[in-house]
Amino acid sequence: MAHKKAGGSSRNGRDSAGRRLGVKKFGGQDVIGGNIIVRQRGTKVYPGVNVGMGKDHTLFATADGRVRFHDGKLGRKYVSVDMMAEAAE
């Protein structure tokens, strides 16, 4: 005979790993073309000048420059990359 009554099993106790979303390059930081600026679910931030959007809504720089976040129409947030003047050689 069993000396202990069988315990019930819990249906909780598991979780998924975080998805590492968020801003990767902040306003004022320099970027080169192809750098990821924001990883997001849906369009929390929209692409502005010199910024592209991937199929998973990731925003990335399409040119070298400096990141700038700004507000646009309809209360949307935008991120642009301002190209810097080329250094005189």
Swiss-Prot record:
Keywords: Ribonucleoprotein, Ribosomal protein. Residues 1-22 are annotated as: Disordered. InterPro entries: Ribosomal_bL27, Ribosomal_bL27_CS. HAMAP family: Ribosomal_bL27 (MF_00539). PANTHER family: LARGE RIBOSOMAL SUBUNIT PROTEIN BL27M (PTHR15893:SF0), RIBOSOMAL PROTEIN L27 (PTHR15893). The keyword Ribonucleoprotein applies. GO terms for cellular component: cytosolic large ribosomal subunit. GO terms for molecular function: structural constituent of ribosome. Pfam families: Ribosomal_L27. This is Large ribosomal subunit protein bL27. GO terms for biological process: translation. It comes from the Bacteria. It comes from Sphingopyxis alaskensis (strain DSM 13593 / LMG 18877 / RB2256) (Sphingomonas alaskensis). Belongs to the bacterial ribosomal protein bL27 family. The gene is rpmA.
